[in-house]
Amino acid sequence: MSTSTNPERAQRLSGQSSTAEFRKHTGSDEELIRTLHKLDGRSYPAYKSVVGMWDFGSFSLSIDRIQADPYAPPSKVRAISTPQEMGLPQAAIASPDARAACADYLLRAFNRSLRERRLHDIQVMSPSVEILDRSACTVKPDRVELRFEVRMPARGRTILGHRAAQIFDLDVPDAVQDTFDYLSDIPEVEREREGLLRHIAVYEDYRTLQQILIDRGWVSFIANGSVLARRSGVSQSPMEGALPFASPATLEAEVELPHAGVLRGMAIEPGVTVIVGGGYHGKSTLLGAIQRGVYAHIPGDGREYVATLEDAMKVRAADGRAVTGVDVSSFITHLPGNADTTRFSTENASGSTSQAASLVESIQLGSTLLLIDEDTSATNLMIRDARMRELVQAEKEPITPLVDRISSLHKDLGVSTILVMGGSGDYLDQADRVLMMDHYRCLDVSDRARQVIEELPRVHQNLTMSAPLARRTPARLHSSDRPKTKAAGLSSITIDKINLDLGDVEQIVDPGQTEAIAWMLRGLLYSYANGTSSLTDLLARLERTLNSEGLDAVVKFGAHGLPGRLARPRLVDVAAALNRFRGLRLSEEEPSSTTKD
């Protein structure tokens, strides 16, 4: 530990001005430790005297907020350094992609240090297997910042100053040095350096692969050798002994990546792709890998070289969700009561209306790839066989199934679809290609499917899919006297007294995304909305703000201080949350339907 005091450096790294009740200090690590010892036995609020910036030599430690009492959320702390002081390789800061991957790796390294050292008084955001932009760690060309929390020890409300001194004299510096030290000439540091460079290489390869999708007009690519199966339904760890993916020869393509070099794998072209196969043979596993391919994955995950268009949207039924002013007329018409389905609203959507709304909302937001699994879909929205068409005449059936619109969806609107169908062959007529999963082996059975179509023809319709009519313009909402913004897990949000369930938005993969979405919803509806800007305009404004200010932009929406547990969500997922929010109101909203079919 350094014993030097460098006030100018500490002030430069702090990024914050002085605040109030207790003066913010600029002092050495030794001064901090002495102060904590002196606080032993005092009442808990005296801990606030250590708020400030402290120089630990190779890094500065900023104690930004002290918890109100021993049972409150823990105190907020930042470790701040520079890439040069840390000895980071130049490759780690050479580009925005490299810096993003570096930040992700450093956060994982800090988590690992806390676990291995069993430092339970120090907490930090625990990342998922996806490489995301997270507020817990940021890397810039001249600054590295790590945000975490420390539970300040006490007996009752009496400060345990000697224990606190130990935490800041040993535990915090040890964990930070484990994370920040790339200068030491020891095997452990060399392994970390190699791991960091590997992490960056995998992320840069993934970003290149996503650009290749755009350049070549593909919607997804799965490299040969990828491990798609997961250990269990509640684990994202790869299944041990799983059969590596191998592309059908007819769909195999070659890509060249900057680090991995030449890879071969399955390239999925635009249009309608149907995945078939027996139960438990890997259909949903393949679709699951494709839907998570909108994110980069860490080395060793097995899906490092699986990439999907980043605006791809998994669409499913969600009984009971709210729908506000959505044009579902391509799928739902002449409802009982003559409700206007060009501007459909309900507080309690059925399976079919909820999925129809999700389809249309995704299209309106510019998604060019829809992902659908029959297991989580409304059957009456997906198919309607000949017998049912004969029994229930068209004029008595308000639902037009997706199978009648899916070809037009691509030809007229440029929206591709990948769907899993194991129980109905109705989509074979519409498919541009048919994949079969057989004991986790992927086969191209498009030719055989065409033979089946000829042998067993079905009467079907190819109806035109029109672009949604409604221009949706959110009205500004007004907050309660005691505003509340809360998120929990992957799917639960509360804004004031309104609860929001995002369980059907399957591509939210990190609790930090859910928390970020909660604050972004408050910003969109309580700050940005003005009754004249469309939903897409509001989202574009939000994206510009995030690009220029980062995740800290949510502070202007009411988030406290320097948030350390946020992960950046995709804009389409923010929009999906907004579309499900029961408080959403549209400007000049027309009378709505509350019908549930």
Feature roles, as predicted:
Residues 1-217, 228, 578, 587-597:
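N-terminal accessory targeting/assembly segments
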Residues 229-264, 309-312, 316-323, 329-331, ...:
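N-terminal pre-Walker A segment at the start of P-loop NTPase domains
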Residues 263-292:
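Glycine-rich phosphate-binding P-loop
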Residues 292-303:
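Post-Walker A helix-loop "phosphate-sensing" segment adjacent to the P-loop in P-loop NTPases
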Residues 350-362:
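Conserved alpha-helical scaffold flanking the Walker A/P-loop in AAA+ ATPase domains
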Residues 362-406, 410-411, 420-429, 433-450:
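Conserved P-loop NTPase nucleotide-binding/switch module
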Residues 411-414, 420-597:
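Conserved NTP phosphate-binding and transfer environment spanning the P-loop NTPase/kinase superfamily
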